[in-house]
A protein has these predicted regions:
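Secretory/organelle targeting and membrane-embedding segments
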Residues: 1-202
Length: 202
């Protein structure tokens, strides 16, 4: 909740372009394609209160999404990768976004003041979908040093490999009382990569 979480970042990056979906993308863009449905659903999974029963998940998710504060223009960044206008089915003067970043807040006691960031784009440096929950810095420095970012975090890699990781500061070796950032990876599931909708259905 807001007492411990500084921000939540949800990223869906793809290293490839629109491929043969140029005409489709001209009608949708990144926001309508993945942000307003897939990434918002992931945000709901992270932020909703635990449902009392399995069948009340949808109700809790809808309640949380209704609490999202209306997003203003200054909280959205849109971009288009170089070469998109040369893709088959794409207008030569297209202004459709292939990258979008959105910041929003949830109007609830639990999440008041905590920014949620959604990012998605094509033709980026890597392909990965992950959730990064940044924790608030502790009130005092354990190692007697100025607390610097990043503080502790929890990272969920949703694809293509499934990984859960925790980022912390650990004491460096030796007598010196100072810390260094390390990442603990308690769970890592690698193997057959499922297509996105196959993973959803299974």
């Amino acid at each position: 909740n807001r007492n411990y979480v500084r921000s939540v970042q949800i990223t869906m990056a793809e290293s490839f372009g629109v491929r043969s979906r140029g005409a489709f993308y001209e009608q949708t863009g990144t926001i309508r394609d993945v942000v307003q449905n897939h990434l918002l659903q992931v945000a709901a999974c992270i932020a909703l209160d635990a449902p009392a029963r399995g069948d009340s998940y949808r109700e809790q998710s809808a309640r949380l999404l209704r609490a999202v504060v209306p997003i203003d223009r200054d909280s959205v960044v849109r971009g288009q990768y170089r070469g998109y206008r040369n893709e088959p089915g794409v207008a030569p003067d297209s202004r459709v976004e292939t990258f979008a970043a959105v910041r929003f807040f949830i109007d609830s006691w639990r999440w008041a003041g905590v920014p949620f960031y959604l990012r998605a784009g094509k033709a980026l440096a890597t392909t990965a979908t992950e959730v990064w929950v940044a924790m608030r810095c502790p009130p005092r420095a354990v190692f007697g040093e100025r607390i610097v970012d990043p503080c502790n975090y929890v990272r969920f890699r949703l694809g293509p490999d499934v990984t859960t990781a925790i980022g912390i500061r650990s004491k460096v070796l030796g007598e010196r009382m100072s810390g260094e950032p390390i990442e603990l990876v308690p769970t890592s599931r690698r193997g057959t990569r499922l297509r996105p909708y196959t993973r959803l259905l299974e």
